[in-house]
Structures are given as C-alpha cells and as structure tokens.
C-alpha cells in the first residue's frame, strides 16, 4: 500500500510526497554534491483539457511524462507533483551543464501530441533551482524553482528560468 502511494497511478512517476522524501534523503546522504531541481509545467493545460476533454488531457500528461522519462538517467529523481506539474532532481557538475540540459528538455517538450484526429501543440515552462546555492531541502528548492517557473510564465511561457 505504501508503494502505491509513492507512485502516481497515471504516469507511473513518483508522487509528490515520494519525490520530496527521496530528494531530502539524497541531500542528507550527499550534502557535498551539486544538484539541480527542475519544475516543469505544461503551458495552457487547462485550455487543452477544456477544448479536447479530460481523456485527451490525461493522454497529454502521459505523453509529457514519457518525454521526460526519456531524457533522464537511472538514479535521477522524477515525479509528478501536481495536475500538470512535474519535478526532476539530478546531480550536476556546474551551471553550464544545467543550461545545456534544460535547453535540450525545453526543445523536446515543445512538441505536438496527437491521438486519433486530435493534434495539439504543447510547450512547457520550466523553473530551476540549484543545491546548495538556492536551498538545503526539497521545500527550499521547490519554492525557489516555483518562483523561477512563475518568472518564465510571466515572460510568455515556453522557456526556462534558472534562479539567479
């Protein structure tokens, strides 16, 4: 039962609670390493749901999560932390590699998702916080990355912001 609560049923990604637990565990076990925490939000997802229905919206979320899964390594932490919001936590060597990674992700998430006769252009806004610079816990990093995500949305979506 605890395992079921740790996994998001639709996407098979970690739940928010499991994501938080694993990140805090990793930070306590390896506090001397550098990490990047990403929040991904599907742009205009409410409009997709309203226009094409919840079944297609669920299909979009699953397709989006599949794209994310294909761009992370085993050992990276990847979770669904809200309706159309996802998080990733990876070990990094420097901020330049974070920028390279997020550019690749942003490009991959700018896609067309289709099923049957429906085709929908999808983009994502991304906020990124770095450990240890931007916080010492999941909650710290989440708040900072969420602020960066908000900045991305304010600038017009379909992009990314790294906390500065």
Give, region by region, the residue ranges found by the protein language model.
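Conserved long alpha-helical elements within nucleotide-processing catalytic cores of c-di-GMP signaling
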Residues: 2-6, 14-36, 43-73, 79-83, ...
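Acidic carboxylate motifs that coordinate Ca2+ or other divalent cations, activating on Asp/Glu
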Residues: 11
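A structural signal for short, well-ordered beta-strand segments
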Residues: 37, 86, 124-128
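Core hydrophobic beta-sheet residues of small sensory/regulatory alpha/beta domains
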Residues: 37-39, 162
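Residue-level recognition of strand-loop junctions within catalytic nucleotide-signaling folds
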Residues: 50, 89-93, 110, 131-132
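Short catalytic/binding micro-motifs of nucleotide second-messenger systems
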Residues: 70-75, 107-119, 151
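Cyclic nucleotide signaling catalytic output domains
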Residues: 78, 104, 118-119, 125-155, ...
